């Protein structure tokens, strides 16, 4: 392998790394825009107490909170939400969405 070939390989690898970095930056920016849009939509949909409750849930169950947020935004976009959701309404919605817990009774003989 000559110096020219080695330089060409280095140049290609550098171009590839730069391309990957730019793609990653674009993906990060897109995620940030989507997150901002979601937060703006939630501010219009939820009352402050309900937003606080959802933020608290996000700390303990991030996947569940993300699902609830997506459902709320979809409901709002489809026009099924006519007014801001209060904390009590959000509690009712969360109760419906949380899967029923299975109770286990252990009987010792």
UniProtKB/Swiss-Prot annotation:
Domain of life, source organism: Archaea
GO cellular component: cytosol
GO MF annotations, alphabetized: DNA binding
Skewed-composition ranges (Low complexity): 16-25
Positions of region (Disordered): 14-35
Keywords: DNA-binding
Biological source species: Methanosphaerula palustris (strain ATCC BAA-1556 / DSM 19958 / E1-9c)
Database matches in InterPro entries: DNA_bind_arc (IPR022889), PDCD5-like (IPR002836), PDCD5-like_sf (IPR036883)
Similarity remark: Belongs to the PDCD5 family.
Name of the protein: DNA-binding protein Mpal_0536
């Amino acid at each position: 392998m000559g110096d020219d070939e080695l330089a060409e390989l280095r140049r290609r690898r550098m171009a590839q790394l730069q391309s990957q970095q730019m793609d990653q930056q674009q993906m990060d920016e897109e995620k940030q825009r989507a997150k901002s849009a979601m937060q703006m939509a939630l501010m219009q949909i939820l009352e402050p107490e309900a937003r606080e409750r959802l933020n608290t849930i996000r700390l303990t169950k991030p996947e569940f909170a993300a699902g609830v947020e997506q459902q709320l935004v979809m409901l709002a976009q489809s026009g099924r939400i006519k007014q801001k959701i209060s904390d009590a309404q959000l509690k009712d919605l969360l109760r419906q969405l949380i899967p029923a817990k299975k109770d286990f009774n252990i009987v010792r003989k």
